[in-house]
Amino acid sequence: MHYFHVKNFIKISLLILLNSYSLSQGFWGKEFPEGKIKYSPRKYICYKAKNVVILDGKINEKAWENVPWTDSFVDIEGNLKPDPYYDTKVKMLWDENYFYFAALLEEPHVWATITERDEVIFKDNDFEIFLDPDGDTHNYYELEVNALETEWDLFFLKPYHDDEKVVLDSWDIPGLITKVHVDGTINDPTNIDKNWSVEIAIPWNTFISNYRSYTFPY
């Protein structure tokens, strides 16, 4: 996320943190090889919510009605990899208290096994968010959620390539709300599911201690 626009919307660059991406110039005295893919993050205009966002995982309330979806997700390596078999896309909103995400993930067999918070959620199929409020690749946030509504939230002091000990795994997002809805049955291989969806509300206060300008959309 690059910056907030103070009026009724914020313009967000969806920053995908790529470990295959690197700078062609020296970075703090280190040299990195040329990246395999062009670094050009897609952008999304995130509007202020006009109605109350009801957090139940279903994405069918009035607040989301006219909110555009992002483009369908692709592999982290872009055109170097084939398109995913199943569609994933997201909507976003904000109000005075929260930054909202609504994700829809196609999956014919919705499956999840991890139930303990801060376990390695990506061993299940999951939805992940990376937030870097000031765009400097340091002091950024990661959140992962699986279809059982299990959360894994982390705080990164710096990029992985800077140091071995860069993650605060014990850190939790205060006031985080996540709600999942499964259109089908979870962990049942005998039938075909349609998708699962997740609604997430991240309080703006989460960013206060690490966001330099303390400028929020309101």
Identify the residue ranges that each predicted region occupies.
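Hydrophobic h-region of N-terminal signal peptides that target proteins for export
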Residues: 14-24
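Structural preference for beta-rich elements and adjacent junctions enriched in aromatics
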Residues: 25-218
